[in-house]
Structures are given as structure tokens and as C-alpha cells.
């Protein structure tokens, strides 16, 4: 039995003890300091013995005389976290000043384009831009005849998912309801609006 006591004293358990604290510092068991820390952090403490309850009541009485400690200030946001790519950061900062971009596809063309509807003031400007973009002639729109004299007819998909001819509704309504544009062959666009 004595050899066991000697063995425990040789191990230097204090040096190899795992605890929550900085290395090289001594932690003193002081009930008053512990209760002050608990009161300052607004956390409850588990009562272990009746002596602890007496010291806690003394500490709370002492706390009334000490100036009240305010809650710590909120943590500052870390700059650069979460990581955002620069193009997304710029687009978030610009906000609603951005344009209304819609995809434009053309039957027979192997590529898509995007156009900003806010750039154009009306249908004639948009149609002129589409003609130069896809190198085709769309022609003039009339409510009776649609796009007469053209092999293609510009159509758009509205919010409801319906395909309509470009020019059927007023420009402002078109800008707010257009989801995407498609330049169809005239034969496919016959049932959408007027006879082409």
C-alpha cells in the first residue's frame, strides 16, 4: 500500500492534468471568483454542497454593492467572411439598379444571347437589336397581320408560361412579364396571335 502512495507522488499528476486554461497558469479554487464569473456570464451554477450555497448567497449580497457589469458588446462581423466572389459582391451591392436580363434563343441558331430590356425604350429598338444580333430581317409588326414579310416571328414567354408574340401587349407590361424571348420560324408562330 505504501508503494502505491509513493508511486502516485512520483507521477507528478499536477503537471499532466488536463484542464481548461492557459498552460503554465495555476487555477485556484476560489468560490467567490467562481460565483462572480457565473453572475457576470449570466449562467446558472450547479450547487454542490451546502457550503457552496452559503458562499453563493454571500457573493450575491456582495454583488449588489459592486457596480453591475453590462453584457459584452456583440461580436463584430469578420471582414471577408463568408467568402464571396467579387462579381457576386458587386452584383449584390448594385441592388435593384440592375437591368432586366432575359435569354434570347433563335430556331436554328446553336447559341443563346442575353438582352437587357431596360436598355430599350420600346419594341422598335428591341427588334432592331435582335435583327443585328442574329443577322436577320424581322420586319414591321401590325396587329392584324403580325410580322408579315418575315421568315421569323419574335415571341416571348410570360410569367404564366404562355408564349405570345412580341408586340401584343404594351411595352411596360411586356418588360415586367417577359421571362425569355424566342425567335420562332413563322410557320410555328401561326397559332400564337395573328396569322403570319
From Swiss-Prot:
Main location: nucleus
Matches recorded under InterPro entries: AUX/IAA_dom, AUX_IAA, PB1-like
Motif (EAR-like (transcriptional repression)): 18-22
Subcellular location: Nucleus
Disordered as annotated region, ranges: 44-74
GO biological process annotation, one example: regulation of DNA-templated transcription
Keyword set, alphabetical order: Auxin signaling pathway, Nucleus, Repressor, Transcription, Transcription regulation
Functional summary from the UniProt entry: Aux/IAA proteins are short-lived transcriptional factors that function as repressors of early auxin response genes at low auxin concentrations. Repression is thought to result from the interaction with auxin response factors (ARFs), proteins that bind to the auxin-responsive promoter element (AuxRE). Formation of heterodimers with ARF proteins may alter their ability to modulate early auxin response genes expression.
PANTHER family: AUXIN-RESPONSIVE PROTEIN IAA17, AUXIN-RESPONSIVE PROTEIN IAA24
Protein family according to the UniProt entry: Belongs to the Aux/IAA family.
Record note on domains: The N-terminal half of the protein contains two conserved domains I and II. Domain I includes a slightly degenerated ERF-associated amphiphilic repression (EAR) motif which seems to be involved in the activity of transcriptional repression. Domain II is required for the correct degradation of the protein through the SCF-mediated ubiquitin-proteasome pathway. Interactions between Aux/IAA proteins and auxin response factors (ARFs) occur through their C-terminal dimerization domains III and IV.
Protein name: Auxin-induced protein 22B
Provenance organism: Vigna radiata var. radiata (Mung bean)
Amino acid at each position: 500500500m505504501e508503494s502505491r502512495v509513493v508511486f502516485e507522488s512520483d507521477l507528478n499528476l499536477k503537471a499532466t492534468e488536463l484542464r481548461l486554461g492557459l498552460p503554465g497558469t495555476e487555477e485556484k479554487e476560489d468560490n467567490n471568483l467562481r460565483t462572480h464569473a457565473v453572475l457576470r456570464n449570466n449562467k446558472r451554477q450547479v450547487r454542490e454542497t451546502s457550503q457552496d450555497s452559503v458562499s453563493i448567497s454571500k457573493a450575491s449580497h456582495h454583488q449588489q454593492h459592486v457596480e453591475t457589469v453590462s453584457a459584452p458588446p456583440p461580436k463584430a462581423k469578420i471582414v471577408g467572411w463568408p467568402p464571396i466572389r467579387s462579381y457576386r459582391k458587386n452584383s449584390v451591392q448594385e441592388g435593384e439598379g440592375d437591368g432586366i436580363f432575359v435569354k434570347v434563343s433563335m430556331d436554328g441558331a446553336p447559341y443563346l444571347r442575353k438582352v437587357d430590356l431596360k436598355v430599350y425604350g420600346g419594341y422598335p429598338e428591341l427588334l432592331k437589336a435582335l435583327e443585328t444580333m442574329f443577322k436577320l430581317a424581322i420586319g414591321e409588326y401590325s396587329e392584324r397581320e403580325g410580322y408579315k414579310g418575315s421568315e421569323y416571328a419574335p415571341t416571348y414567354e410570360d410569367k404564366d408560361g404562355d408564349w405570345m408574340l412580341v408586340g401584343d401587349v404594351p411595352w411596360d407590361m411586356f418588360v415586367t412579364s417577359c421571362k425569355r424571348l424566342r425567335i420562332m420560324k413563322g410557320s410555328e408562330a401561326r397559332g400564337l396571335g395573328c396569322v403570319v
